[in-house]
């Protein structure tokens, strides 16, 4: 019979090799005779944590601490559980206790640094990462985490350096490849390099959270559809199995399923569910105090849409604050500052400091204009910074969190029967949910089709939506339309050279010559709006419609042909068209969509009639009367706090 010491050493060896279940069985066997061994209890608790059985893990770690209150490892282990459950403050308390017992405890310092980063205590987080570097300068994990921190601080070049150093120190660090890939994809638009990093990460750990969705979304930006169907099928299966496989925003552009959207968004935020909601007493402010939180107070679609709302607010009834959480500042930032009672850059202060500031300013309503999009900082709202918290405009879907009281929409983008797919209470505007400027300056420079590389006597189909919105199915539909309309071309927005080449190759496979697909470079807003008018018919994408690009087309007098689906993002163009009296351009299947596009291209008088319709102010007033829109929005705010 083996001695307890031999069994214990065997169990530890199995544990180190990753055979957690086998090690656990031996630990349990040993515990029967060694019930007061705090180290054994710690190791046993750790096996449960590794199997995500946090309740059982915490139970054994609590016993370990009770037996030996000076056992640093058990405090650190329990801290890990708290962090996994989203209880970062409790986690930090345990890490602090572990460090007080064992000053040079690397794991506890590293875990504390990560927890501090997760609650946006960035400066304190940096201090503990620096301690970790001193303790272990060759540890790949530290540099990976420093990369994450710099990404949070919007220091993207520095973040890239840290991820690269992490990979240099450990070629098998899947997380570092994954994180660098995401950085390259989102902040550098280096999609090819991002895909390579995602591939490297997958080879090391094929079950890494969200890796499959990130890779497919990056490939969509390049129109790389070679394995599209197979990859999408895997993602759909993993969603059914409640796996973290795709981010909510990426899901929107691929799958038209609002129920599934709610499920994956709630899964994405599951660590924040355990944070207790606190009842905030309604304020007694003389004015209703609104805080608009956005990463887009610069030259961005959300800024273009919201500018007149900020300008038109009734300052005798409302006090409005702009909270900037994004890294970019430009002339649009300077322009909008003057419309707020106060404009505050909070991009480099902690969530706790933002909560204190919000409390000091006595916010009645906090509006999230960014949602689950680029540079989001939704952790701010988990601190409940106002009595009422609202999801509006920046993200066309549910936030998937009980921390939001309302989503502002209209009855087309969220019909009554779809309210169940939103964690927020849906509150409706009477017309289109989308804010718009009443007038936008358009370049007065004389220009013609030739100036933009367009043929003079061809029918111009156009779509200026982002590349990732173009799916193989919708592109095939467009090629079917071009086949039937020989005297036509398709005008698209060029995001990168490889995307253009891939799209030409796809067109060739479908029997369309590349000279019938033309690309436009990105231009400043004034010049961009000038060229939009040369489109004869805007062909919309599906399942992620044109949103800002749709209202831009309408403003330029260009009719839009759209497909209406079930999800919010697949119904936005339908809402816009309904509000300008062009419901006849809304379709629910590709066959009818194609038929109508072909019919219109062969009947230019009808196109002229549609364009004339869009030049009449009476048809556009619902969409572009920003003063009336702001009054409707203010009625909602009053209702929210009543």
What are the residue ranges of the model-derived segments?
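Alpha-helical solenoid repeat scaffolds of the TPR/TPR-like class and their adjacent stem/linker regions
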Residues: 1-454, 466, 476, 505-512, ...
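Substrate-binding clefts and catalytic carboxylate motifs of secreted carbohydrate-active enzymes
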Residues: 462-473
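Short alpha-helix at the nucleotide-sugar/activated-sugar donor binding site of glycosyltransferases
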Residues: 554-555, 578
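Short Ser/Thr-rich beta->loop micro-motif in glycosyltransferases that lines
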Residues: 370, 540-546, 564
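Charged active-site motifs of nucleotide-sugar-dependent glycosyltransferases
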Residues: 286-289, 455-461, 488-489
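Donor-sugar nucleotide-binding helix/loop cap in glycosyltransferases
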Residues: 539, 553
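A conserved nucleotide-sugar
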Residues: 317-319, 479-509, 514
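Short acidic/histidine- and often glycine-rich active-site loop of Leloir-type glycosyltransferases
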Residues: 570-581
């Amino acid at each position: 019979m083996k001695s307890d010491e031999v069994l214990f050493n065997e169990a530890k060896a199995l544990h180190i090799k990753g055979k957690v279940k086998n090690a656990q069985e031996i630990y349990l066997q040993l515990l029967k005779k060694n019930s007061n061994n705090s180290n054994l209890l710690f190791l046993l608790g750790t096996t449960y944590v590794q199997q995500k059985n946090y309740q059982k893990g915490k139970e054994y770690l609590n016993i370990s601490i009770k037996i030996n209150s000076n056992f640093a490892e058990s405090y650190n282990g329990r801290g890990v559980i708290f962090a996994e459950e989203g209880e970062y403050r409790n986690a930090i308390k345990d890490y602090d206790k572990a460090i007080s017992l064992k000053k040079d405890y690397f794991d506890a310092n590293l875990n504390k640094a990560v927890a501090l980063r997760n609650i946006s205590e960035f400066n304190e987080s940096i201090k503990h990462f620096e301690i970790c570097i001193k303790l272990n300068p060759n540890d790949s994990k530290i540099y990976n985490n420093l990369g994450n921190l710099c990404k949070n601080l919007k220091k993207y070049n520095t973040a890239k350096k840290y991820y690269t150093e992490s990979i240099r120190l450990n070629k098998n660090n899947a997380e570092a490849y994954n994180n660098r890939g995401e950085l390259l994809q989102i902040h550098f638009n280096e999609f090819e390099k991002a895909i390579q990093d995602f591939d490297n990460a997958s080879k090391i750990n094929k079950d890494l959270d969200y890796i499959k969705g990130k890779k497919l979304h990056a490939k969509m930006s390049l129109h790389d559809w070679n394995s599209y169907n197979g990859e999408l099928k895997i993602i759909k299966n993993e969603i059914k199995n409640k796996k973290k496989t795709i981010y909510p925003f990426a899901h929107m552009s691929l799958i038209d399923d609002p129920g599934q959207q709610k499920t994956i968004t709630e899964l994405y935020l599951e660590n924040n569910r355990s944070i207790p909601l606190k009842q905030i007493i309604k304020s007694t402010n003389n004015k209703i105090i609104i805080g608009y939180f956005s990463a887009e107070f610069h030259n961005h679609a959300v800024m273009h849409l919201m500018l007149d709302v900020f300008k038109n607010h009734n300052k005798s009834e409302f006090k409005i604050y702009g909270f900037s959480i994004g890294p970019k500042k430009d002339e649009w930032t300077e322009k909008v500052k003057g419309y707020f009672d106060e404009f505050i850059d909070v991009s480099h202060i902690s969530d706790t400091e933002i909560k204190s500031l919000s409390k000091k300013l006595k916010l009645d309503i906090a509006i999230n204009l960014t949602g689950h999009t680029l540079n989001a900082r939704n952790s701010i709202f988990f601190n409940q910074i106002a009595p009422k918290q609202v999801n509006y405009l920046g993200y066309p879907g549910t936030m998937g969190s009980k921390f939001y009281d309302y989503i502002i929409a209209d009855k087309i983008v969220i019909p009554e029967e779809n309210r169940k797919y939103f964690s927020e209470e849906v509150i409706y505007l009477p017309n289109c949910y989308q804010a718009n400027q009443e007038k936008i300056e358009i370049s007065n420079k004389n220009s013609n089709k030739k100036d933009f590389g367009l043929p003079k006597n061809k029918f111009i189909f156009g779509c200026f939506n982002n590349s990732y919105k173009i799916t193989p199915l919708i592109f095939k539909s467009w090629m079917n339309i071009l086949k039937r309309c020989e005297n036509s071309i398709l005008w698209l927005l060029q995001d990168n050279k490889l995307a253009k080449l891939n799209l030409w190759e796809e067109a060739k496979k479908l029997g369309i010559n590349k000279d019938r697909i033309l690309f436009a470079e990105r231009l400043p807003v004034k010049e961009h709006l000038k060229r939009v008018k040369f489109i004869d018919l805007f062909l919309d994408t599906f399942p992620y419609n044109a949103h800002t690009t749709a209202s831009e087309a309408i403003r330029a007098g260009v009719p839009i042909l759209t497909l209406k689906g079930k999800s919010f993002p697949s119904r936005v163009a339908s809402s816009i068209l309904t509000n300008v009296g062009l419901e006849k351009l809304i379709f629910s299947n590709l066959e009818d969509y194609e038929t109508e596009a072909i019919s219109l291209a062969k009947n230019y008088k009808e196109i002229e009639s549609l364009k004339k319709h869009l030049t009449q102010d009476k048809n556009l007033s619902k969409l572009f009367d920003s003063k009336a829109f702001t009054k409707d929005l203010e009625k909602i705010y009053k209702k929210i706090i009543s």
